């Protein structure tokens, strides 16, 4: 994928991006250069002061692709709260142009590899998409958003990650996570088949997916691919892990009745039949009245193999097996069955109604995973995605409806966090060997920076063979300087480029190292006019690739003209003032400066000025 142009036409703008904000990601010349070097991956690096609008660009793209994804999944399943033809979702008006690689089956020998796509939305209307060069391909007549073309004109995945708590970026992804859960619950209610992977393409891969990302990569990737992990964090081999799957959750009577597929006429007919059968058994009207609701519920339970009833008294004696569509017999290709076949040991924990799967990892274990998950780390990860999403079962229908229509920055805080033993899926005892550490260690023992590096690079490794859009908001905040300096190189290792796959990535950063490893056409410098609040995006104005950290820091990218900290600068200014007054012994002042301050260009210049003041024709004041 290659972004070309974004314009916000929403009269209210989008966050700090005003109406008529427009950015061209590539010039025609730079685009042609990129297309000629298809295997040379390089992300866009968005830089600028805090509050300059760089994260808002990522948020706008996420919001736009959320609207496109809602339109795409409307053909299969969509919650009622999102079924409005023109949902009031910000931005309500925009234009977006991009290129995306077209699958080989849609191309003829003379077709170009890239489709040019135009997306636009006007206020009060549905989002539209147009395949602008469709005539160059082996497809049907010219059309907008129809049939299978929606699938090939959109990125395979739109992936979000933030090292902090960027609620605005995560909100559209968070909504899609609930769409994924509701899609599964709908299939469970209707007893439909379920593919075992998410139908939605938007995924916000926060820290809750860290263990899944690491496991999938260590189980599937070869040594060369894992080099990015090895070189910085020192991860060696996966030793063991446990998966715990809870089968059943309690249902109250209202939740149980939501599984009743009968219409009103059928419900009335069923109730009359049950009452008539009770009368033939000689029950009184009073006895029938007391029990008829329970009898109806038992018929609902009989109609759905995921439902059951316990002997416990009260209204929560009903149970739902949330894993019912994912579990089968020993030879089944369903997710839980496949995980069982890969396990070293499995057993049922009756106390917790849970399936426990233990894995002691060796080459046979890896081979079992390859055989059961199509030889793909991504297929296994998507299976984990489905299982982890089931942990959202505790969210009420009312809260989900509010969430689907919410614009709140704090929506995730309203979602309950389950205790570990209440979750449908959880990992335990993920242990691996690490260079310089005698005993296998657990993921939780790693530092924040190690977590962050494994997470961000692991995400790239999983989706390396896809045409995806990555939106990474300050992914390197916990890195040491060496890791920051190498981060772009590590990304290039993980996404080396392939003729059939082309990823687009935008990274926001405050790190000059990322800019020093990027060509100027891939550096977007953000600034906000203090008077008008207007956000502008400009090129850096100099060759950033290989530029020194001081050069980048002191340029308009960050606008910091000092190379030392504020407290040290204040002390240096005080010493400069003392020198300019002319009352100080110069040798003593130089000794004091040298003793109190470390080496810096500012210190050198001040000492030089003091020494030069003794030369004929020089003044003692500094300009």
Positions of the model-derived regions?
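Switch/communication elements of ASCE P-loop NTPase nucleotide-binding domains
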Residues: 1-80, 394, 398-566
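Extended helical coiled-coil dimerization/tether regions that scaffold
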Residues: 2-15, 26-28, 209-451, 458-469, ...
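Conserved P-loop NTP-binding catalytic core
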Residues: 58-126
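Short linear, low-complexity motifs centered on an aromatic residue
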Residues: 168-194, 563-580
């Amino acid at each position: 994928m290659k972004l070309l142009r974004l314009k916000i036409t929403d009269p209210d703008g989008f966050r700090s991006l005003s109406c008529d904000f427009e950015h061209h990601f590539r010039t025609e010349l730079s685009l042609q250069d990129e297309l000629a070097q298809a295997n040379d991956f390089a992300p866009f690096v968005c830089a600028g002061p805090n509050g300059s609008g760089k994260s808002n660009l990522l948020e706008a793209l996420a919001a736009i692709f959320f609207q496109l994804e809602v339109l795409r999944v409307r053909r299969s399943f969509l919650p009622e709260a999102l079924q409005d033809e023109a949902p009031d979702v910000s931005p309500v008006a925009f234009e977006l142009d991009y290129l995306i690689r077209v699958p080989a089956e849609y191309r003829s020998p003379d077709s170009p590899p890239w489709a040019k796509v135009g997306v636009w939305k006007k206020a009060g209307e549905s989002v539209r998409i147009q395949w602008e060069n469709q005539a160059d391909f082996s497809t049907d007549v010219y059309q907008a958003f129809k049939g299978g073309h929606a699938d090939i004109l959109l990125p395979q995945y739109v992936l979000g990650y933030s090292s902090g708590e960027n609620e605005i970026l995560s909100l559209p992804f968070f909504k899609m996570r609930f769409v994924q859960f509701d899609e599964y619950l709908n299939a469970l209610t209707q007893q439909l088949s379920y593919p075992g992977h998410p139908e939605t393409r938007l995924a916000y891969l926060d820290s809750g997916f860290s263990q899944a990302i690491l496991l999938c990569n260590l189980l599937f990737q070869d040594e060369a691919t894992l080099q990015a992990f090895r070189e910085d964090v020192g991860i060696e081999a996966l030793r063991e892990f446990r998966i715990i799957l809870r089968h059943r959750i309690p249902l109250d009577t209202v939740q149980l009745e939501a599984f009743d597929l009968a219409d009103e006429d059928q419900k009335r007919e069923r109730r009359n039949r049950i009452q008539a059968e009770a009368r033939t058994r000689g029950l009184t009207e009073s006895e029938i009245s007391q029990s008829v609701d329970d009898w109806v519920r038992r018929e609902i339970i009989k109609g759905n193999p995921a439902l059951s009833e316990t002997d416990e008294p009260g209204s929560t004696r009903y149970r739902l097996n949330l894993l019912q569509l994912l579990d089968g017999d020993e030879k089944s290709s369903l997710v839980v069955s496949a995980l069982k076949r890969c396990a070293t040991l499995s057993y049922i924990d009756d106390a917790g109604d849970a399936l426990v799967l233990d894995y002691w990892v060796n080459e046979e274990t890896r081979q079992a995973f390859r055989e059961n998950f199509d030889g793909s780390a991504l297929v296994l990860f998507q299976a984990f995605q489905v299982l982890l999403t089931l942990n959202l079962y505790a969210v009420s229908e009312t809260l989900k409806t509010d969430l689907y229509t919410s614009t709140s920055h704090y929506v995730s805080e309203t979602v309950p966090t389950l205790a570990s033993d209440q979750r449908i899926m959880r990992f335990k005892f993920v242990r691996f060997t690490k260079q310089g550490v005698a005993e296998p260690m657990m993921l939780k023992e790693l530092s924040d920076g190690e977590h962050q590096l494994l997470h961000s690079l692991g995400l790239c490794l999983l989706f390396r063979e896809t045409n995806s859009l990555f939106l990474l908001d300050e992914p390197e905040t916990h890195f040491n300087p060496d890791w920051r300096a190498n981060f772009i190189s590590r990304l290039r290792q993980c996404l080396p480029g392939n003729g059939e796959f082309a990823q687009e990535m935008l990274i926001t950063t405050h790190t000059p190292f990322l800019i020093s490893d990027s060509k100027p056409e891939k550096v977007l410098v953000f600034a906000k006019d203090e008077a008008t609040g207007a956000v502008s995006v400009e090129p850096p104005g100099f060759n950033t690739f290989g530029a020194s950290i001081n050069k980048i820091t002191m340029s308009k990218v960050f606008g910091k003209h000092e190379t030392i900290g504020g407290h040290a600068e204040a002390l240096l200014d005080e010493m400069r003032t003392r020198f300019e007054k002319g009352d100080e012994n110069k040798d003593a002042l130089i000794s004091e400066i040298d003793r109190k301050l470390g080496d810096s260009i500012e210190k050198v210049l001040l000492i030089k000025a003091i020494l030069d003041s003794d030369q004929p024709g020089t003044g003692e004041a500094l300009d």
